[in-house]
Amino acid sequence: INYAVVTVVGALLAVNGHADVASLASYLVFVRQAAMPFNQFTQLSNFLLTALAGAERIFAVMEMTPEVDEGKVDLVRVSGYESGEESWAWVTPSGEKTPLAGDVRFDDVTFGYDDDQTVLANLTLFAKPGQKIAFVGSTGAGKTTITNLINRFYDVRSGTITYDGIPINDIKKSALRSSLGIVLQDTHLFTGTIADNIRFGKLNATDDEVIAAAKIANADKFIRRMPRGYNTVLTSDGANLSQGQRQLLAIARAAIADPPVLILDEATSSIDTRTEALIEKGMDALMAGRTVFVIAHRLSTVRNSDAIMVLEHGRIIERGTHRSEERRVGKECTSWC
């Protein structure tokens, strides 16, 4: 603004013969050079304030007391002597190994993010090995909270959650979370090749395993159409892919991890109808023999579930199959059928 004012005033003086053009040009250069240090100081001050705020947050995180993991039971991959295929097994503190089945149970679980808030109240449910359990309900009903508790991102206020009969508090957090494959509504990809992004689900995976996982998710065809195929470099957060393509890569990432338990949080919400139809076949193959939890806002996306739980205000108000829920004429069906 100051520079513009000086320019206008100087131009008027030059027009009226009170100053020549050369003097005006020299004065304008002087004004710009004189103002430059102040502008740079202002920018530097803003940068320093931002850096100080970031540093305070970093030190606050570094000074936080780490959560104590009291889990003693571990979970490892073991290879079959004859088939060579890997499977999951529990390892007790004594070293005894027991095959993992994938039985997940909630017994009278109550939970709230704050002491004066209850998100889930007296929740009881179970998922047998190989079953597909779906949760439907409005936003804030507690669907995602259930999956957060399975991951043990939070501890329950009362009640118990067991995994193959083992209380999840007795399982090492790293072991528990390594056995869970999660496909979220928002897909997070990293700068790097497509193959590396898929391999993030299993860092030591071979190229053949990467391709096999992509085929399960029906992502192989679009990947091969990319300029460099699986070696195509993705920009930050996969900005050079469509939302549907990013979602397919997230599904492939879950497939390569080969988890015994899958959590699908609106995994097809950002995919068009045609793409959704493409992944359904792959998802059926991916879910075979696994315990699956599906979060959805409408019943049409969970039609093949073994059981559908309709949640409202942290409670299960309906249980049934897709067919039985569609036949209901109450509030639940009219909202999500």
What are these regions (language model features)?
Residues 8-12, 56, 266:
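Transmembrane alpha-helix boundary and packing residues in multipass membrane permease domains
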Residues 71, 78-328, 335:
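ABC-type nucleotide-binding domain
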Residues 28, 35, 177:
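Conserved catalytic core of two-component sensor histidine kinases
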Residues 34-64:
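Cytosolic ends of transmembrane helices, especially the final helix of ABC transmembrane type-1 domains
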